[in-house]
Regions:
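Intrinsically disordered, low-complexity, charged/polar segments
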Residues: 47-124
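Short beta-strand-centered aromatic/proline hotspots
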Residues: 26-34
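Tryptophan-anchored aromatic micro-motifs
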Residues: 12-21
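Short, solvent-exposed secondary-structure boundary/capping segments
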Residues: 37-45
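Mixed-charge, Lys/Arg-rich low-complexity intrinsically disordered regions
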Residues: 1-12
């Protein structure tokens, strides 16, 4: 069985993964940069920046990467478009642009069962 460090080491810029916050919140994250020690990611739905330890997959706040399973191409594309949409539009000025499309809803519904059925090995 491959250990979690091996899976985490393979993550690269542009990939999407799932993490969980200590309160159980789902964090759909896009890798924005990597170095030997850290993996920097942005939450797609909130645009929060997170820094994960590359060895453990944890943030200083206790968020933990729990799945790095690749998404089907179309789902990945829709989530990248959603990330871009949330980057360029201001919800206070253009709230109508933040309404989810049917494709975006479908992609977000797909994520939970997909990542839940493809977990990383637990921390040792």
């Amino acid at each position: 069985m491959t250990d979690r460090k091996s899976f985490l080491a393979k993550l690269d810029v542009g990939e999407i993964f799932h993490a969980e916050a200590p309160n159980g919140a789902s964090l759909i994250c896009l890798v924005v940069s990597v170095d030997e020690a850290n993996l920097r990611a942005r939450r797609i739905t909130s645009q929060d920046d997170l820094v994960f330890n590359r060895q453990s997959g944890m943030t200083a706040d206790g968020d933990i990467i729990d799945s790095v399973a690749p998404l089907p191409g179309e789902i990945h594309k829709v989530l990248l478009e959603l990330d871009r949409k949330y980057q360029i539009y201001d919800p206070n000025k253009e709230p109508e642009r933040f309404r989810l499309t049917e494709e975006e809803k479908k992609a977000l519904r797909f994520v939970k069962p997909h990542y839940s059925s493809n977990p990383l090995p637990p921390l040792p």
